[in-house]
Amino acid sequence: MDTILTVSQLKKVYGGRGSRTTALDGLSFSVSAGEFTGIMGASGSGKTTLLNCISTIDRPTSGVITVEGTEVTALRGKALSRFRRERLGFIFQDCNLLDTLTGFENMALALTILGTAPKAIERRVREAAELLGLEGVLDKYPYQMSGGEQQRVAAARAILTRPALVLADEPTGALDSKSAGQLLRQLSALNQGEGTTILMVTHDAFTASWCRRILFIKDGVLYRELRRGDLDRKAFFAQILGVVSLLGGDSADVL
């Protein structure tokens, strides 16, 4: 499989002399096309900093991040903005839908910004709505949708530009268990059916069990890696809990 994401010797240090905090300490890994990879770790482990660096929200102190052969850490200005719009998709804990736009309009926004032809926007929005079971909310405003529907609209928006990589930061954090399960099933279907490459940060072992591979971060370095392989989700969940118990610290920060 082609490598979509490469993180090499990534380091992120906050603060100055006398007050320096190392969030990432030479972290390296890669993600292949079509993988559904989870990032787990206790509070302060560096997992959110890692996602912020990959998403170009933050810049690393040193190291290299490459997405589809493009060295993201070397991009600046308009080139960086264009790369972010075209090659990365984002799903956040807060779905960030615009209250004055319908579900259709919220989903179409990224394509509109890219200057996509109206007919192509119409076709791709309706295709994404069918994939994610959103046909019934296209004409609704966010306040008329459930939390799970809002988050699935955000997920549809993230994939409409056909990005190389979808970055999800605690996407189920604000959802009840039923809505979280629906979203995770849809993300899994996108990954397996459409080959969407997903990198998801989560503190929740149940959420992580939907991934095919988990990277555990501790003190800014890669602590351990799990692959689901032929395991069913229940068995993989048990494996995840086993590693979490070895991470140390406050388990409530991870589970």
Report residues per predicted region:
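Conserved beta-strand-loop-alpha-helix hinge in the C-terminal portion
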Residues: 221-245
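Non-catalytic connector elements of ABC transporters
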Residues: 245-255
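Intrinsically disordered, low-complexity regions
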Residues: 1, 32, 237-238
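Generic alpha-helical segment signature
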Residues: 3-4, 233
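ABC family nucleotide-binding domain
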Residues: 4-5, 10-217
